[in-house]
Regions:
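Extended, compositionally biased accessory segments flanking or bridging domains
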Residues: 1-98, 194-214
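ATP/nucleotide-binding catalytic cores
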Residues: 49-184
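Conserved GTP-binding G-domain of TRAFAC-class P-loop NTPases and closely related GTPase folds
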Residues: 166-214
Length: 214
């Protein structure tokens, strides 16, 4: 769980402390630093669709969405509880819409030429073909690893907070290295993409801390 009430300086770093951030690829979203203090980015926007998952704390999705708004994404949130996303929606302003379903996403016309982000916390995972076009990113937030889900069986990346998610991911994705993410210390996140499993210490700016405080 991301804890924002008390944030030890030794765990949560300021972006200005990491000069190598400038070397990150344009399609990656900075998450934080690994155990060697190297920047870690999550692939999030590409020439094809990107499918992501978040496990354990919806505020991870808030952070990702906020950073993707900063690189020009238009945001759609599908949820049964819009209040859960109120701070993110307020920050996004007219670049965000919220509703109970993803009907009509991704946008067509001039808006469809911009990067499109769909964040959903609905119990059912999105259809695997949703947003199957360039610069479309889908992010599903779940409290447990959805077994038997075609979407989750083909995710490009997962961020997780808390204990016990690594082993189910290892089974679902045939990724034994995901088991290394079962035991995260307070203030840490686990990142699993198609190439690696890594423990990450998040890097948060002051504005992001305020955004993540309930």
């Amino acid at each position: 769980m991301i804890t924002t009430e008390v944030l030890p300086a030794s765990r949560w770093r300021d972006p200005r402390d990491l000069p190598a951030v400038l070397e990150l690829p344009a399609t990656g979203v900075l998450i934080g630093a690994d155990r060697q203090q190297k920047p870690v980015a999550l692939p999030a926007i590409g020439p094809g669709p990107t499918r992501l998952g978040v496990l354990g704390d919806h505020r991870i999705a808030t952070l990702l969405a906020y950073r993707l708004l900063g690189v020009g994404c238009r945001l759609t949130v599908t949820t049964a509880d819009p209040a859960r996303w109120r701070r993110l929606l307020a920050a996004a302003g007219d670049r965000a819409v919220v509703g109970p379903s993803a009907l009509g996403w991704p946008a067509a016309g001039p808006r469809g030429a911009e990067p499109q982000l769909l964040v959903t916390d609905l119990p059912a995972a999105p259809p695997v073909g949703l947003g199957d076009q360039p610069m479309c990113t889908v992010l599903h937030v779940a409290t447990a690893v959805p077994t038997g889900s075609p979407y989750w069986s083909d995710v490009d990346g997962v961020l997780l907070a808390g204990h016990g998610y690594g082993t189910p991911l290892a089974r679902l994705l045939n990724r034994p290295d995901a088991g290394e993410l079962d035991q995260l210390s307070p203030g840490q996140l686990g990142l699993l993409d198609r190439e690696r499993a890594v423990v990450v210490t998040p890097i948060l700016a002051e504005a992001e801390l305020a955004l993540l405080t309930d």
